[in-house]
Design a protein with these regions (language model features):
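N-terminal binding-site loop/beta-alpha segment at the start of enzyme catalytic domains
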Residues: 1-63, 95, 123, 191
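Active-site-proximal loop/turn and secondary-structure-junction residues that shape catalytic pockets
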Residues: 2, 38-40, 69-73, 103-106, ...
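Glycine/proline-rich, positively charged
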Residues: 7, 72-168, 172
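Conserved, mostly hydrophobic/aromatic
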Residues: 19, 34, 49, 65, ...
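Short, well-ordered coil/turn segments that N-cap beta-strands
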Residues: 30-32, 59-63, 94-98, 124-128, ...
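Conserved beta-strand positions
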Residues: 36, 67, 99-102, 132, ...
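Aromatic-lined glycan-binding groove of carbohydrate-active enzymes
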Residues: 168-206, 241
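Terminal-tail/helix-coil boundary detector
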Residues: 179, 203-237, 252-256, 266, ...
Length: 316
């Protein structure tokens, strides 16, 4: 989400020159997994990333690229999937996608149609592996069961909402992932910046202007504050930043393969990479976790193309 033309929803994104600089530094630091979507920046995120890779990456095998499909007029119909993969490949200037993720569950088309179409992409070598995002456990199990029944490619990863102040995935999803031999690439691992600073610190543009993230976290700020205070305590104790501690916590979880973290400043990228110098003790982790109380589940119900929840009284 950090790359692409500025939009009303995400006005803080990086232009092409800034994208080049950010990706160049990321590659220098050893980062090789990049996540985007056909809808980010109205498609320009894929374009900017593709342009940067063309200039900076000598061997395509040195990077792992994930992109997503769902937000289009056909959602996850076979026709829409076949059309959208061609658009993503063109914008990214690539012959294949390493990890192709369905961005949401499609309540309007049979999962059999979706999984068959995705399997055809794998067979045609336009996609190497399949992932999913923002799904309930029953949906993931249904999708993989359908694929298994027909001998089709299954999902190997899920990109769900998970961080130190939102741990509802620990109820059922993580146990299912263990059984399915899948991994997580959690989105919002830093809770849109809420676990990177104390509430009275300077507020970033995203914290104040991102309506979706305000709805996700603002209602729970009172029950989250004690945890955020403990993050600050641990950070001060081990001479780290709060962001590093929060990311170290999520990286301590065995099924987390790669948290999805976005940056708008190279200094943020460099600081976060220092997380690999940090190791939280078992006592630190227990101290950070023991105050957690159940949260209202961020819904993943049927949504319209303009991303409005059909249950407006819930948070999206």
């Amino acid at each position: 989400m950090s790359f692409g033309k500025s939009t009303k929803v995400r006005p803080w994104t990086l232009n092409q020159e800034e994208t080049d600089a950010m990706i160049k530094r990321a590659l220098e630091l050893g980062i090789n997994f990049f996540d985007t979507a056909n809808t980010y920046g109205e498609g320009s995120s894929e374009e900017f990333i593709g342009n940067s890779f063309k200039k900076l990456v000598k061997d395509r095998k040195d990077i792992i690229v994930a992109t997503k499909v769902y937000f289009n007029e056909g959602k996850l119909s076979k026709e829409a999937i076949f059309r959208e993969i061609e658009g993503s490949l063109k914008r990214l200037q690539m012959d294949y996608i390493d990890l192709y993720i369905i961005h949401r569950w499609d309540y309007d088309h049979p999962i059999e149609e979706t999984m068959e179409a995705l399997n055809e992409l794998v067979k045609s070598k336009k996609v190497r592996y399949l992932g999913c995002s923002a799904m309930f456990p029953y949906q993931l199990l249904k999708a993989n069961s359908v694929a298994r029944k027909h001998g089709w490619a299954e999902f190997i990863s899920i990109q769900n909402h998970y961080n130190i102040i939102y741990r509802e995935e620990e109820r059922e999803m993580i146990q299912l992932l263990e059984e399915e031999k899948m991994v997580m690439t959690p989105y919002s691992p830093l809770a849109a910046g809420r676990v990177c600073r104390m509430p009275d610190d300077e507020v970033t543009k995203r914290l104040s202007d991102d309506v979706t993230n305000v709805k996700k976290y603002e209602h729970a700020k009172e029950i989250d504050l004690p945890i955020i205070k403990r993050i600050k305590e641990i950070a001060d104790k081990i001479k780290a930043t709060m962001a590093q501690v929060s990311l170290a916590w999520i990286l301590s979880k065995p099924l987390v393969a790669s948290p999805i973290v976005g940056f708008t400043k190279i200094s943020q990228l460099e600081s976060i990479c220092d997380v690999f110098k940090i190791k939280l003790t078992d006592e630190d982790i227990k101290y950070l976790e023991e105050l957690y109380v159940p949260h209202k589940v961020v819904p993943m119900y049927k949504i319209t193309p303009i991303i409005e929840c059909t249950f407006p009284n819930l948070y999206i």
